[in-house]
Design a protein with these regions (language model features):
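Active-site-proximal cofactor/substrate-binding loop regions of enzyme domains
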Residues: 9-13, 21-23, 31, 39-59
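A non-catalytic, amphipathic alpha-helix used as a structural packing/dimerization or gating element
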Residues: 16, 20, 91-94
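Short, structural beta-strand-to-alpha-helix junction motif
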Residues: 43-44, 84, 185
């Protein structure tokens, strides 16, 4: 299967998520930023600081080879220790607004994965805040399109995803005459590939194990 990159898709995803997430964050009390998330050791504030730092590094051309290591992530979060919660939200809004054109201009898909990861982290924040539909919303369609392209390029586990409410299946991973088959909601698929909690979900998976679908964590 051939796959043509849509360079505008990451920016669309980031702007769509910006318009949903930023107003939500501005309306939350300070105590909510101390809530724990699905990311081990990280609160809502930690996740937001990581996301804003990652996007600003993209905008300013400061992404080093090898990506975002745990040490770099910890450093980015520590550097924002003196910022207020809303200052971090301000920086995140800037990153979600300005990173799209930079990602579109890149001659590779690596930055596309950053945009998708930001959207997943936004879901982590929503879930910690108790907002329904954590990994759903207006950004789900572009997120699925990005996921499909990235998994094919990186030759991930072949998977035919039969998603609830979708007429056509979503094809993920390397070309294969016998892909694994997933049947369930798109939001649960996101949880599977991102290694997020599956408590209370329903789905069917044949031809692969849950661990085989983990694309990023």
């Amino acid at each position: 299967m051939t796959d043509i990159r849509d360079p505008e898709l990451p920016g669309l995803l980031l702007r769509t998520e910006r318009d949903a997430l930023i107003p939500l964050l501005r309306a939350r009390p300070d105590d909510d930023f101390a809530l724990r998330t699905a990311c081990p050791g990280w609160t809502v504030r930690h996740v937001l600081a990581h996301c804003s730092a990652a996007l600003i590094r993209v905008v300013e051309g400061r992404v080093e080879a090898g990506g975002f290591t745990p040490e770099e992530n910890d450093r980015d979060i520590a550097e924002r220790a003196d910022l207020s919660h809303q200052q971090i939200v301000d920086e995140l809004e800037r990153g979600m607004t300005e990173a799209g054109p930079v990602i579109a201009a890149a001659a590779h898909r690596w930055y596309d994965g950053i945009a998708l990861g930001e959207w997943v982290h936004a879901g982590d924040v929503r879930e910690a805040l108790g907002v329904p539909g954590a990994y759903e919303g207006e950004g789900l369609a572009p997120a699925l399109a990005l996921l499909a392209g990235l998994t094919r390029v990186r030759k991930a586990q072949p998977l035919l995803a039969r998603l609830d409410g979708h007429d056509a299946p979503l094809v993920l991973g390397a070309d294969s005459p016998e892909p694994a088959v997933y049947t369930g909601s798109a939001a649960t698929l996101i949880r599977l590939v991102a290694g997020r909690p599956l408590t209370g979900t329903r789905y069917e998976l044949s031809g692969a194990r849950e661990a085989d679908l983990l694309f990023f964590g």
